Amino acid sequence: SSLVGSEMCIRDSSYAIVAEKYISPTSELPSHLSIHDYLLGRGRNQKVVIHTHPIELVAMTHNAAFLGRDVLSRLLWSMIPETRAFCPKGVGIVPYALPGSIELADATIAQLDDYDVVLWEKHGALGVGENVIEPFDMIDTLSKSAQIYMSGRAMGFTPAGMSDAQMQQLKEAFNL
């Protein structure tokens, strides 16, 4: 059968159809294609773009105190050592922009040279990698750190996190 309008189907690496029916592309398609174009244009080996909506990370973008440059990176890194290891460049923040817009894509691209993962304020997270595991692990580990922070807050305390000295020791030990 042939596709109609803006419909598309999902195929695996051998071009076999893996979706049972044709599906419409996501409203985020322009952003994703712009990001792929950027990665290809820079000669980067990252071929995978993952966009998801991790509840705890999105919730944290609703707090203006976390939106300053590197504030959230520092906080999340301090919760568990794995976060710094999986996301050594940290997390960038893109102020709210209309989902699927070119403005959102451009703002995301501006963050990708400096950060491993980009959070879209009040929306979601985006990571890139050479394979699907890389961005998944980064976002998953950031989400775990956010869960630890929020669990502590829910129990009535603010988690202390690792000290600056502990974070520096981790950075040096793992060449981060």
Model-predicted segments: where are they?
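Extracellular interaction modules
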Residues: S1-G5
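Glycine-rich flexible loops
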Residues: S6-E7, R11-L176
